[in-house]
Regions:
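N-terminal signal peptide c-region/cleavage motif recognized by signal peptidases
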Residues: 14-18
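A short, surface-exposed beta-strand/turn
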Residues: 101-124
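Sec-dependent N-terminal signal peptides
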Residues: 4-13
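N-terminal secretory signal peptides
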Residues: 20-88
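C-terminal partner/receptor-binding element of secreted or periplasmic proteins
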Residues: 121-158
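A mature extracytoplasmic/lumenal domain signature
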Residues: 81, 93-97, 118-122
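Short, surface-exposed coil-to-beta transition loops
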Residues: 86-89, 109-111
Length: 158
């Protein structure tokens, strides 16, 4: 009986400690963190300018190889609910390459995807990221707390 009570007490303590730890480090997408229209607008603008910047450089860089049609899917960051600190950011891409089989007329398609981690410095907040990348060329702007850019993250991925 005593052993059962002790087990239940330890299990309850572990559950409470785990719940508290999870509550402290709960992450969401930026939409779950933002509280002002200005934050939403800055995020939408950043994502659009990153996609445009990628399209502008793709033909001379990433899209010269086997896949000339690499397309930006989504730039996303995880944000700690309480502090606004970024957990990580990733930019997803997809492409295709089609080849016709001459003897059958069948089309073979390769459809690679990439999930490119962005080199965000520890303890960077989403608001600091938005401010640092607010200019005309967020693809090449230095990320907060580092000399690296979003573009640098892509060169190690695509």
């Amino acid at each position: 009986m005593l052993r059962h009570v002790l087990f239940v007490a330890v299990a309850m303590f572990t559950s409470v400690a785990s719940a508290q730890s999870t509550a402290r480090t709960q992450y969401t997408d930026p939409y779950g963190y933002f509280t002002t229209d200005a934050q939403y607008e800055a995020w939408y603008s950043l994502r659009a300018r990153l996609a445009t910047g990628f399209d502008d450089v793709c033909g001379d860089t990433f899209c010269e190889g086997d896949f000339s049609n690499i397309a930006s899917l989504r730039f996303e960051c995880s944000v700690q609910r309480g502090s606004g600190r970024i957990g990580s950011c990733v930019w997803s891409f997809a492409a295709s390459s089609e080849e016709i089989v001459p003897t059958t007329g069948r089309i073979e398609v390769l459809q690679p995807t990439w999930q490119c981690p962005i080199p965000v410095a520890p303890h960077t907040t989403i608001d600091a990221l938005l401010a640092a990348l607010a200019g005309e060329d967020p693809l090449h702007a230095p990320l907060p707390g580092t000399t690296l850019s979003v573009y640098d993250g892509l060169t190690h991925c695509l």
